[in-house]
């Protein structure tokens, strides 16, 4: 201990080495002497029982003095040791850091050496096309580079060079792997750019190499499994399989799904397996789901055996790389697109159009389940039920959606078809509407019981006179053939709803309502110009609207007890649509009537107000205007003949003829001077209208039946009798006019007010006493 302390103190400049050693030696000897004396004293005190109290106290004093000297020396030593210890620690730390730097440099050099060795071994393996060892060596080089990059003190320029070298080598091996992959998996495409046609598909082939070539002049190819494993080690397998999957989907799987006549043919050769196509004649526009599933299954089975089920795990180090499932990787890349293709091109078209065929769809659901089970067994799929099977199982919803879509499309096609193709309807015409099933027997019994309970004590409530059986029938007229089919479509759809599920029934019911909403919006817009320009089409459209409104009155009631319970609470009605359809037809026909009135008035405006008929030019213009008016009315009578119901026809023609007559009367009564010749010619013009006017009333094609309506012209033309009185006045004398006035009780008084009669008398006769007397009688 003394030598260690002395050695430590030797490094201090404040304490001399010899002095310190001497004093320590002296203290040591003194300690030994005192120890002996103390022992001797204790022996004498406790062993010999000598009275040594005084000597003991002296010894205590000496011991205390010695202890103080020791403490001072110890304190001095500690001070010196701490000072030198700090200096030694700093030096030791510097040495340690130097050692660590040397170790890091040594490690970096070792990593560089390993990187270089890995690259050399990689090049050797690549030259021999040993792709798996080459990929592993490249992976080792990449790990070395990662460690080098983790050292912040490493030269950045060198790191950049190493990274570039590694990238170049990786691209090099990927290039060689890609070349061999193209030799192992060979695609053959047609020369044409259009690959979607059937001819192009028939020229598309996929060849998978299964064995090594035996020819000496050919370089042996690596196995597909070694190429795939090398891709996996390099992290490029998912990308490569995804690219292969997209080509497989585009050039093989999708054509098989979309083209029903296309079938896959498997050709097996000693060193390869080929997948090509053949075309078989078929009448189907779209393949059935079971057929499409079988086509895809055949292709996937070949790929499973020749490509997807190859052993890739045998050469992998345990625990380093997880097991590779090629089928699963391929499925992840293409299943979403493949299932969507199957749904859009197969399952959609397999949905029944009639509820009676829904039971047959169970076979398609079963085939879909088997197809999905096969895909899961080959590990192409994983997890729960896919969208494909969910779509197939949700048949009720798809059936309803498709049915509703088909109904709306068919309805719109009918609405946009030609209006002028018509059929005759009437009380005697039985429209081809479907027979409705009877309500449930229980409901009938319940209704009968209620009726009996309510009217047991009632008397005879039958009216004395019964209504005509045709009281609520639609009058005979012509409607568009398309509208008749549209109504049949509505009945058929509601009849379909009676045998469908509740959800489907609700959708079908509201689809029928949508048909009529669509008619209200589409027809007036789509046929706008024709309805405005062609009076016959306007009349047919009027009939169409009235025909639809007529059926809507009872359509809901007919199906009220046959639809789903959810619809039997009062919502099964179409009555709310009736006013809209009546208004739609009426407005269209009234607009046409206004247009015809405008044309009539425009023609009469060229008659020069029927003034100065003694002028040949004026008379010719007036005569021409009258003939044009009659011609227009005859033309309307022909185009509306057998189209409009008789009562509507007569009212319409009567209104137009009345407009023309009223205009002629207003112009003639406004004349201030009518000469005898003018009167004769005006009478002639009016006589033409009076004779030919009734002939425009020809609602029926049978002329003999039209006589009835021609005789009833005054019923439909309110100005007919006043017009006849005007003709009489134009040829009558003052006496005859007075007689027809008959003190305001004659036919003339009924036809004209006194002011107009007086004005006509003043225009027709000169100012004489007889005229004054006649005017005096007109009051």
UniProtKB/Swiss-Prot annotation:
Q: According to Swiss-Prot or TrEMBL, what is its membrane topology? A: Peripheral membrane protein
Residues where N6-acetyllysine occurs?
777
N-acetylalanine: modified positions: 2
The listed locations are: Cytoplasm; Endoplasmic reticulum membrane; Chromosome, Centromere, Kinetochore; Cytoplasm, Cytoskeleton, Spindle
Q: Which residues form a coiled coil?
A: 14-130
Region span, Interaction with RINT1: 2-317
What GO cellular component term, any one, is given?
Answer: lipid droplet
Q: Name one GO biological process term.
A: regulation of exit from mitosis
Residues bearing PTM Phosphoserine = 3, 12
Q: Does the keyword Endoplasmic reticulum feature in the UniProt annotation?
A: yes
Q: One short Pfam family name for this protein? A: Zw10_N
The subunit structure is: Interacts with NBAS and KNTC1/ROD; the interactions are mutually exclusive and indicative for its association in two different vesicle tethering complexes. Component of the RZZ complex composed of KNTC1/ROD, ZW10 and ZWILCH. Component of the NRZ complex composed of NBAS, ZW10 and RINT1/TIP20L; NRZ associates with SNAREs STX18, USE1L, BNIP1/SEC20L and SEC22B (the assembly has been described as syntaxin 18 complex). Interacts directly with RINT1/TIP20L bound to BNIP1/SEC20L. Interacts with C19orf25 and ZWINT. Interacts with ZFYVE1.
* Family recorded in the similarity comment: Belongs to the ZW10 family.
Q: What does this protein do?
A: Essential component of the mitotic checkpoint, which prevents cells from prematurely exiting mitosis. Required for the assembly of the dynein-dynactin and MAD1-MAD2 complexes onto kinetochores. Its function related to the spindle assembly machinery is proposed to depend on its association in the mitotic RZZ complex. Involved in regulation of membrane traffic between the Golgi and the endoplasmic reticulum (ER); the function is proposed to depend on its association in the interphase NRZ complex which is believed to play a role in SNARE assembly at the ER.
Protein name as catalogued? Centromere/kinetochore protein zw10 homolog
The species is Mus musculus (Mouse)
The encoding gene: Zw10
